[in-house]
Amino acid sequence: MTQAAEHITVLLHEAVEGLAIKPDGIYVDGTFGRGGHSRLILQQLGPNGRLIAIDRDPQAIAEAAKIQDPRFEIVHGPFSGIASYLDERGLLGKVDGFLLDLGVSSPQLDDAERGFSFMKDGPLDMRMDPTSGQSAAEWLARADVDDIAWVLKTFGEERFAKKIARAIVHDRVTEPYVRTRQLAEMIARVNPSKEKGKHAATRSFQAIRIYINSELDEIETALNGALQVLAPEGRLSVISFHSLEDRLVKHFIRKHEKGPEVPHGIPLTEAQLAGGRKLKSVGKALKPSEHEVNENSRSRSSVLRVAQRLAE
C-alpha cells in the first residue's frame, strides 16, 4: 500500500457544532473515515453519552479500532444501513444527531492502490469496500457504450461522455483498462474540453466512482433512514463535495420542510399541515472559510447543511 497523506477533516468544527451536542446524547457518525468528527464528538460527550460510527472501508475500521472508549462503537457497513443498525440496538427515534461527510476521503484518494485518483498510477478499483462488489476495471470490461456514456453523463456531467465511452469499448478489445493512469491518459487524449484548473479525467473518474459505489442511492437511503432514527429535535449534519450530492441533500431537506403535497381545494388546518413537516433547516448552507481552503484545497467545493427533526 502506498503512503497516504494525513487526512484533514473538512468543516470539522462547523459540522459537529451543527449537531448541538448534548453531553448524555446518542450520536451517529455515518462516515468515520479517519475519525476526525468522531473524536471531536467524543470530546464533547459526557460519561453517559454514546457514539456509533459507521464505515464500509476496512482501513477506516482498522483506524476506529484504535479508539478504546466504552462510549464508542464502530459498525462495518454502508451508511445506508443506518435504520437497520439502530433498530438492532433499539435506538430508532432516539438519536440526537446524525453526521455524514460524503464522498471520497483524502487517504482513499492518496493511496494509489485504491484506484480513486487519476493523478497516481494504480489498479482501477474505486470501491469504498475493496472486499465487496465489482471494481471499476471489471465494470469497464463488460459495460457497453451506452451504459458507460450514461454513467459519465449522469454522474459526471461529462459533455464528451459518448466519445470517451466509444474509446473505452474500442480499446479494450486489445488492451482492457486495468490501471488508473491508462484510463486517465486516454481520456485526456480524446476529451477536447479544457476546463480551467480541472484535469480532463476529473468528471469521468467521479462518475465511475459514484456508479461503482452506488453513492447517490446510498445517500438517499441514509437520509430517509435519518427520519427513522432521529429523536424530535435531533440534528442532521451533512457535508457534500459536489453538486449532485448537495442537490440531493438540499432537495431532501426542502421536501420534508414543506411536508407532503396536498391537492388544491382540500381544506386542512395549520396544525394538520405542520404535522406533515418532518424537518426544518438550521441556518444557511455553509462553505469553508478562505483560511480553511488555503490550508486544504480539497475543502473548496464542500457545503454543510444542517436540519432538525420535528415531532410528528
Swiss-Prot record:
GO biological process assignments: rRNA base methylation
Region (Disordered): 286-306
One function term, GO molecular function aspect: rRNA (cytosine-N4-)-methyltransferase activity
SS bonds (residue pairs): none
Compositional bias segments (type: Basic and acidic residues): 287-298
Compartments in which it is found: Cytoplasm
EC code(s) of this entry: 2.1.1.199
Gene3D superfamilies per UniProt: Putative methyltransferase TM0872, insert domain, Vaccinia Virus protein VP39
Keyword annotations of the record: Cytoplasm, Methyltransferase, rRNA processing, S-adenosyl-L-methionine, Transferase
GO cellular component terms given for this protein: cytoplasm
Reactions catalysed, as given in the entry: cytidine(1402) in 16S rRNA + S-adenosyl-L-methionine = N(4)-methylcytidine(1402) in 16S rRNA + S-adenosyl-L-homocysteine + H(+)
Pfam families xrefs: Methyltransf_5
Binding site residues for S-adenosyl-L-methionine: G35, G36, H37, D55, F79, D101, Q108
Superkingdom of origin organism: Bacteria
Function as written in the Swiss-Prot or TrEMBL entry: Specifically methylates the N4 position of cytidine in position 1402 (C1402) of 16S rRNA.
Family classification: Belongs to the methyltransferase superfamily. RsmH family.
PANTHER family associated with the record: 12S RRNA N4-METHYLCYTIDINE METHYLTRANSFERASE, S-ADENOSYL-METHYLTRANSFERASE MRAW
Protein name per UniProt: Ribosomal RNA small subunit methyltransferase H
Name of the gene: rsmH
